[in-house]
C-alpha cells in the first residue's frame, strides 16, 4: 500500500478541495507542530480496495419535503410487533412507514403549538436529535404501553433546567420528552401533550445531545430491560473548554442511564437504576453510566453477547467507535481516541493507550484519511453488529461509518480490534443490475441531481438496524430511505 502522502496527492489531483478544512490540516496552512505532536497519527491510509464488501442498496421509501427542503432524516426505529418503521426528521417530525415501504404517514409534528415543544432546528446540529419507542410500546396493559421518547433542541428556556454548566450565557435548551399514544397501531399520534422529563441548558450551539436508545438485547425480567440510555454531548464549542466530559459532577459529556417509568430522581420525573455505577458516590451525578464522551451519535448492542458500542465524533484528528461498560471512562478530553489530546490542532504521538483506567476505542481513523477528502470533513456514525443471514457477506461484521463522506466500514465483531485503522475495510453499494460499486455519497449526489436539488456535498449518513436484521440508511439531502440487501 502506498504511503499516505502519495495517496493524498493522487486524490487531491482529482478532488476539488476548495473550502475543505481537511485539505490543509483544518483551517489552511499552519506552523509546524512541535516534536511528539501530529495531526495525522495513522501512518497507513484505510485500504481502498482490499477486503471490500459489496451489497445492494434499494430505495425503500421517501419522506416529504418541508417547505421545499429535503427531510433531514436522523433516526429509524422499528416496532417489532407490527414491523412498522418509524423515522424522524430533524425539522421536528415523526413518520410511520408500512413494512413494505409503500405508505408513509405523518405520525407526529412536534412543531404544532398545541404540544408546547418549540423545536429549534436552525443549523446543522440542532432539531429533533433522536427518538425511541419503549420496548413495551405495543404491549397492551404494560407500563410502557404507547410510550415513546423524543430528544429535542428547543428555543424556550422554561421551566428551569435540570442540568446546567458554569457558563453564564447559553444558546438554547435540550429536552427529553415522554409521549403516550392511546392507539400505538394508529398511523397518527392520538395522545396528549408530552411530559417533560429532563432539560439541559446548552452553553454552546453544537454537540446537542446525540442518541437515545433502549438496550435492544435486554429481555423482560433482565436488569437492563426498559432502561433508557441517553447520550449527552460535552456542551460544544471545541476541545471541551468547560472540561465537562471528565467532570463526574456534570451531566454533560456522558452517557446517562435512567428508568423512564421510575420516579426516584431528584426531580421525581424519572427513575435512577440502583445498578448505575455511581449511584452511591457522593458529588457524582447518579444518572451517569459512562463518561469522557464528546458527541455520542449512535449506540448499538451485539445480540450475541450484549456488548454495547458507541460512535463518538472526534475533535479534528481522530474519529472513533468505542465499547461502553458501566462506569467506563471513554477518555475525552484527555484523550482523542488512543492519543493524548493536545489541542484542536494536534495529539501526542507518545504514550499511546497508556492509561489503564481509560476505555479506548476498538477502532478509530484519521479525519484527513484520503477516503474522507471528497467531503472535506469527518464524523463517526453507526454502530451496528450484523448477526443476520439475509446478507451473508455482512454476517459477524461490526458496521460503522463516516457521516459526511458516506463511507461505510466493517470489522470483525468476533475478533474486535484494539484501536487504529489498519483493519478497517469498506462497504460499497450496488444500486441495480449492471451497476458498479459506489460510496453512499456518490448515490446521494446522483439522486439530488435527478431531483433537481443542489448537488449534495455531504452524505450525512445515518443507519439503523431493525429487530429482523434489516439495515436502513438515511441522509439529510434527498429524503430517501434505503435498505441493504444481498
Regions found by a protein language model. Give the residues of each.
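Bacterial N-terminal signal peptides
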Residues: 8-18
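Sec/Tat signal peptide C-region and signal peptidase I cleavage site
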Residues: 19-23
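Acidic, Gly/Ser/Thr-rich repeat motifs that build Ca2+-stabilized beta-propeller blades
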Residues: 24-239, 298-301, 306-317, 377-415, ...
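Blade-edge beta-strand/turn elements of extracellular beta-propeller
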Residues: 44-68, 102-122, 178-203, 224, ...
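Extended hydrophobic/aromatic segments used for targeting, binding, or gating
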Residues: 96-98, 104, 266-271, 322-323, ...
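Predominantly five- to eight-bladed beta-propeller fold
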Residues: 166-177, 243-263, 322-344, 348-349
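Extracytoplasmic, non-cytosolic globular domains
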Residues: 244-259, 287-325
Amino acid at each position: 500500500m502506498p504511503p499516505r502522502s502519495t495517496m493524498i496527492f493522487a486524490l487531491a489531483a482529482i478532488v476539488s478541495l476548495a473550502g475543505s478544512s481537511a485539505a490543509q490540516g483544518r483551517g489552511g496552512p499552519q506552523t509546524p507542530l512541535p516534536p511528539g505532536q501530529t495531526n495525522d497519527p495513522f501512518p497507513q491510509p484505510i485500504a481502498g480496495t482490499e477486503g471490500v464488501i459489496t451489497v445492494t442498496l434499494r430505495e425503500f421509501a421517501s419522506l416529504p419535503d418541508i417547505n421545499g427542503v429535503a427531510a433531514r432524516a436522523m433516526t429509524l426505529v422499528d416496532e417489532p410487533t407490527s414491523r412498522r418503521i418509524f423515522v424522524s426528521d430533524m425539522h421536528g417530525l415523526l413518520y410511520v412507514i408500512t413494512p413494505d415501504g409503500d405508505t408513509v404517514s405523518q405520525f407526529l409534528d412536534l412543531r404544532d403549538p398545541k404540544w408546547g415543544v418549540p423545536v429549534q432546528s436552525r443549523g446543522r446540529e440542532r432539531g429533533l436529535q433522536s427518538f425511541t419507542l419503549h420496548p413495551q410500546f405495543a404491549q397492551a396493559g404494560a407500563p410502557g404501553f404507547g410510550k415513546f421518547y423524543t430528544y429535542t433542541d428547543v428555543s424556550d428556556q422554561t421551566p428551569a433546567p435540570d442540568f446546567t454548566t458554569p457558563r453564564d450565557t447559553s444558546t438554547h435548551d435540550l429536552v427529553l420528552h415522554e409521549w403516550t399514544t392511546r392507539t400505538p397501531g394508529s398511523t397518527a399520534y392520538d395522545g396528549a401533550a408530552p411530559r417533560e422529563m429532563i432539560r439541559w441548558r446548552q452553553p454552546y450551539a453544537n454537540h446537542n445531545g446525540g442518541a437515545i436508545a433502549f438496550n435492544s438485547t435486554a429481555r423482560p425480567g433482565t436488569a437492563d430491560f426498559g432502561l433508557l440510555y441517553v447520550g449527552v454531548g460535552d456542551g460544544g464549542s471545541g476541545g471541551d473548554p468547560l472540561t465537562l466530559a471528565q467532570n463526574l459532577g456534570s451531566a454533560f459529556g456522558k452517557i446517562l442511564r435512567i428508568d423512564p417509568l421510575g420516579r426516584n430522581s431528584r426531580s421525581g420525573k424519572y427513575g435512577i437504576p440502583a445498578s448505575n455505577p455511581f449511584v452511591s458516590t457522593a458529588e457524582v451525578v447518579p444518572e451517569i453510566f459512562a463518561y469522557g464522551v464528546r458527541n455520542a451519535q449512535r449506540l448499538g448492542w451485539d445480540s450475541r453477547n450484549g456488548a454495547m458500542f458507541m460512535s463518538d465524533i472526534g475533535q479534528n484528528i481522530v474519529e472513533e467507535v468505542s465499547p461502553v461498560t458501566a462506569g467506563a471512562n471513554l477518555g475525552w478530553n484527555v484523550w482523542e481516541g488512543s492519543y493524548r489530546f493536545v489541542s484542536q490542532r494536534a495529539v501526542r504521538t507518545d504514550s499511546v493507550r497508556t492509561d489503564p483506567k481509560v476505555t479506548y476505542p476498538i477502532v478509530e481513523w484519521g479525519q484527513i484519511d484520503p477516503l474522507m477528502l471528497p467531503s472535506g470533513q469527518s464524523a463517526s456514525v453507526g454502530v451496528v453488529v450484523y448477526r443476520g443471514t439475509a446478507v451473508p457477506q455482512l454476517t459477524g461484521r461490526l458496521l460503522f461509518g463516516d457521516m459526511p463522506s458516506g463511507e461505510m466500514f466493517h470489522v470483525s465483531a468476533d475478533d474486535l480490534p484494539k484501536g487504529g485503522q489498519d483493519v478497517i475495510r469498506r462497504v460499497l453499494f450496488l444500486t441495480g443490475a449492471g451497476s458498479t460499486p459506489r460510496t453512499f455519497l456518490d448515490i446521494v449526489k446522483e439522486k439530488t441531481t435527478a431531483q433537481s436539488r443542489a448537488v449534495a456535498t455531504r452524505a450525512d449518513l445515518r443507519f439503523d438496524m431493525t429487530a429482523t436484521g434489516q439495515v436502513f440508511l438515511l441522509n439529510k439531502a434527498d429524503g430517501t430511505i434505503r435498505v441493504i440487501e444481498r
